[in-house]
Curated annotation (Swiss-Prot):
PANTHER family associated with the record: CYTOCHROME B
Residues annotated as binding heme b b566: H111, H212
Topology Periplasmic: residue spans: 68-94, 150-193, 271-329, 383-388
Gene that this sequence comes from: petB
Cofactor(s) this protein cannot do without: heme b
UniProt protein name: Cytochrome b
Organism from which the protein derives: Cereibacter sphaeroides (Rhodobacter sphaeroides)
Molecular functions per Gene Ontology: metal ion binding; ubiquinol-cytochrome-c reductase activity
Keyword Cytoplasm in annotation: no
Amino acid sequence: MSGIPHDHYEPRTGIEKWLHSRLPIVALAYDTIMIPTPRNLNWMWIWGVVLAFCLVLQIVTGIVLAMHYTPHVDLAFASVEHIMRNVNGGFMLRYLHANGASLFFIAVYLHIFRGLYYGSYKAPREVTWIVGMLIYLAMMATAFMGYVLPWGQMSFWGATVITGLFGAIPGIGHSIQTWLLGGPAVDNATLNRFFSLHYLLPFVIAALVAIHIWAFHSTGNNNPTGVEVRRTSKAEAQKDTVPFWPYFIIKDVFALAVVLLVFFAIVGFMPNYLGHPDNYIEANPLSTPAHIVPEWYFLPFYAILRAFTADVWVVQIANFISFGIIDAKFFGVLAMFGAILVMALVPWLDTSPVRSGRYRPMFKIYFWLLAADFVILTWVGAQQTTFPYDWISLIASAYWFAYFLVILPILGAIEKPVAPPATIEEDFNAHYSPATGGTKTVVAE
């Protein structure tokens, strides 16, 4: 699979040769786990295995929960309470599934920001990056529909607000909204559709993950230096790489164990910490909650959605130019989806010839401002749209777009990066000096 020179699987026994000539699945598994991997990967390269664990956890717990769930507006809330009270281990299954979604998004955000910092989106890994963004979009759709299924107050009203965004599309919006809901409002048809799609999408995600893995196995892994593995010969490649098994698998298993220690502590001792108490109240279309908020992992983009009100000058200009077609609501919808889309375009927006942020002094400053901006958007997305939160969300939203659309293209032209090492071997030896038996040495970055 990888373009890096390495030893491929060779069948030895008769049964291995027979199977290999008909279905080379052993060779596929061998090339997957023995892929040459840059030897200088740091601890930010653990999130892939955490994400794989989360996907398996969500599929397994979701299948079992679906056996006991009833997708009907009169029975959904009661069926969830039945799972919690009467199904053996049902409460643990639900808490694992709900908190597993949070771990899934924590890991994917760290995975994305690691890629943004180390330039994992740059050539030749654009396809890997775009497939990763498709996975993220599928995760968001799956999580949103899953949040509706318990049929609590926040489930119902969250679905009403979010699906109402499609109604903001000029001309065809209401038709799309009605088609999506299966009627004029969130009701039984909506719940059935969301349950069916929520069950289906994890398997779509699994297929996209397989393509994602295939893509980065074809190009090889990125690494903290952004320097490519030497591919002139197998001997040269071995100076820059080690096999994924056992070196990085052991490291990933250890990291996963540490992450799961924290995860199971949350599941066991404070399983509702990341949830919302209003969702323990059955959905009531006649009673609107005082403050409607989505799950925490949607809050950054929810903040961007709410930031652009009718009194913002950008919205007023867009409304004037479009002769009233683009109002504040539609502008907010465009901004929310644009904030996600702009991440998919980053391979072409970042014009710097240097891949890794480790060697880009100006880039580091703006990147960490972006990370802080993301945290601020998450926080302000859970607040009321009153002063000063409305101004904070507007400023934070403006910086999000400015980073990708203005700062990155300009930095590529004006920044003077530090020269990266010539090879991965050179970087590895600088951090783990052979003279000290591989002991880590402190090197300024």
